[in-house]
A protein has these predicted regions:
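A short, hydrophobic beta-strand-centered structural micro-motif
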Residues: 35-45
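Short acidic low-complexity segments
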Residues: 26-37
Length: 139
C-alpha cells in the first residue's frame, strides 16, 4: 500500500530533476540546513480516509534569501527577492502539474498557493505550494 511518505519521495525525485534548469543555490530536500541559500523543501502532512480512498497533503516550500542592501545612513536593509521567488515557484508548479500516472494508484493537485511569507528570525521569504494527494487502494 502506497503512503503519502512514498509520494513525498516521488515529489522529491520529480523536483530534483525538473528544477535543475533554475540552478538553485541550495537544494531540493526535506529539511533546511543553510538559510543563506535557495531551497525547495518537501513536507508530508499525512493522510486520512477509508481503505478504498485516502486523502493526504504535501507542502512544497520555496525558500529564497532576501536581497541585502545598504541604506544611505549605512544601516542594512533586506528586501524580498520577489522575481527569484516567482521564477522558482513557476518552475515548481510546472513540474508538479506535468506529472500524472494513473497506473500507480495516486494523483495530486495543487490545492492552493499562499503569498510569500517572511521566515521568522531569518533574512528570507518563502512561498508554500500545497498539494492534495488522492490515494486509491484497489481490492
Amino acid at each position: 500500500m502506497i503512503t503519502v511518505e512514498d509520494i513525498q519521495i516521488k515529489v522529491y525525485q520529480l523536483l530534483k530533476e525538473k528544477l535543475k534548469a533554475v540552478k538553485l543555490t541550495g537544494s531540493v530536500g526535506y529539511t533546511r540546513h543553510d538559510f543563506t541559500k535557495e531551497d525547495v523543501i518537501i513536507l508530508s502532512k499525512g493522510s486520512e480516509g477509508s481503505s478504498d480512498l485516502c486523502v493526504g497533503s504535501i507542502v512544497v516550500n520555496i525558500h529564497v534569501p532576501d536581497i541585502k542592501s545598504k541604506k544611505k545612513d549605512g544601516s542594512i536593509l533586506y528586501d524580498i527577492n520577489f522575481p527569484r521567488l516567482m521564477e522558482i515557484r513557476t518552475a515548481t508548479i510546472e513540474a508538479l502539474n506535468s506529472y500524472y500516472n494513473a497506473e500507480e494508484g495516486y494523483n495530486w493537485v495543487i490545492s492552493h498557493l499562499d503569498p510569500a511569507t517572511k521566515e521568522q528570525d531569518q533574512d528570507e521569504h518563502f512561498f508554500p505550494v500545497y498539494l492534495e494527494i488522492y490515494i486509491r487502494h484497489n481490492k
